């Protein structure tokens, strides 16, 4: 069956504006009728929902208040619902989303699912947040196998996480401390950066080329929000 993600719907809209004949985008069945040619068109791409989720979780982890502009909260229901369940304050105003960290984070269980369920691409970031919640959280990965490579690196920072089959059991809150860590993929690298914001002391995240595949100038954006973060050419 076809993926139902907003990005698929947005691409179909763009191609249709260029003269394509595509129906069913956003459903399990997409029908494409061939055309002789495509023509030019103007199209505004939708905002990156995973980048928005990453910054929202980072704000919650660092006990800050951040307003994300130009987001689509309707594309983030599963993530925002879990953040609210964890005690994170959210305020929606049009295309703006303000994230206000609560006084105490509550543990929540998360299971990754196809859209519109909780996205696997926000699983690692959410795990970092749960290391700061008081209690036990269970994060279950149902989309990809072996997508817990970040667990051992989070453990280097002091996280208490145990893998049990497709699930990771997170016990919190953990007082994270800086240490050298190594990113294994795109979202794991984002999770390690978030954990570094929480950790006391200096953390060096290696292999940040993973990070650049999915985030544009994330270090500069975090620095503008007050983070003490520097990029090293040999990282």
Residue ranges and their predicted role:
Residues 1-235:
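Short, structured segments at the rim of ligand-binding sites
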């Amino acid at each position: 069956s076809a993926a139902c993600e907003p990005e698929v719907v947005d691409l179909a809209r763009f191609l249709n504006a260029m003269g394509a004949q595509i129906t069913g985008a956003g459903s399990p069945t997409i029908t494409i009728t061939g055309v002789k040619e495509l023509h030019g068109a103007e199209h505004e791409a939708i905002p990156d929902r995973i980048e928005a989720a990453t910054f929202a979780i980072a704000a919650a982890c660092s006990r800050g208040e951040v307003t994300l502009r130009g987001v689509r909260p309707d594309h983030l229901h599963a993530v925002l619902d879990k953040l609210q369940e964890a005690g994170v304050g959210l305020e929606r105003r049009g295309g703006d989303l303000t994230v206000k960290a609560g006084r105490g984070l509550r543990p929540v269980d998360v299971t990754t699912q196809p859209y519109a369920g909780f996205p696997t691409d926000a699983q690692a970031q959410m795990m970092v947040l749960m290391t700061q919640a008081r209690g036990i959280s269970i994060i279950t990965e149902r989309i990809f196998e072996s997508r817990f490579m970040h667990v051992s690196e989070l453990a280097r920072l002091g996280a208490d996480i145990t893998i049990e089959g497709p699930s990771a059991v997170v016990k919190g809150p953990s007082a994270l401390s800086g240490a050298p860590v190594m990113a294994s993929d795109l979202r794991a690298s984002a999770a390690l950066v978030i954990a570094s914001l929480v950790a006391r002391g200096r953390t060096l995240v290696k292999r940040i080329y993973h990070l650049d595949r999915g985030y544009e100038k994330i270090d500069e954006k975090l620095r503008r929000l007050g983070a003490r973060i520097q990029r090293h050419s040999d990282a």
